[in-house]
Amino acid sequence: MQEIIGTLLLMAVNFSQYDMPEQHPLIEAVNHQQLIDTLCEGKECNALAYYDDKKNTIFYDDKLTKDSMIAQGYIVHEMVHFLQYQHDAVIEEPDCKQRMLLEREAYQVQQRFLRSHHIMTYDVDMAIRLLSGVCSR
C-alpha cells in the first residue's frame, strides 16, 4: 500500500471537502488480531482498518492488498478521518451524533471512490443507512 498512499490521499481529497494537507499519514499493515485487540476489545469483529490520530497512522489488515479496489476503498475511508483531523473537523470529545457525522462523511467518500471504479457499494450503502440509528439506541 505504501506505493499508492499519495494516490489514495488524492482520491480522498478529490471526493471530500478537504484540501490537500502538507503531510501524509503513515500507513502500516498489522495482523487481524491486532485490529481485534485494538478496536473490538479482543472479541472477533470485522475490523479492517483504522486511523490513529495520536500516531498519525492508518493501520490496516495485512490481508488487504494494493491491487484490490475494495481494499483501497478502506484506506480512502481512513484517509478521510486523517483529513478530518488535519482540518480540525474533529472536536475534542465529540458526542455520538458528531462521531456518526464524521463516519458518514468517510463512508460517503469511500462510496464515491468505489463507484468511480464501477464497483458495487452495497456494504457501504448499508453502513451509511445503519449510522442514522446508532445514536438513538
Summary of predicted features, one role per range:
Residues 67-84:
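Short alpha-helix carrying the canonical HExxH Zn2+-binding catalytic motif
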Residues 39-46, 95-97, 107, 134-136:
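Sequence contexts marking disulfide-bonded cysteines in secreted/extracellular proteins
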Residues 94-129:
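Post-HExxH zinc-binding segment in Zn-dependent metallohydrolases
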Residues 25-31, 81, 119-124:
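Short, intrinsically disordered, charge-biased short linear motifs at domain edges
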Residues 1, 72, 76, 102:
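Hydrophobic (often cysteine-bearing) scaffold residues that line and stabilize catalytic clefts
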Residues 1-58, 63-64, 68, 115:
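Auxiliary, metal-adjacent structural segments of Zn-dependent hydrolase domains
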Residues 61-65, 92-99:
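Second-shell loop/turn segments in exported
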Residues 79-96:
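Catalytic Zn2+-binding segment of zinc metalloproteases
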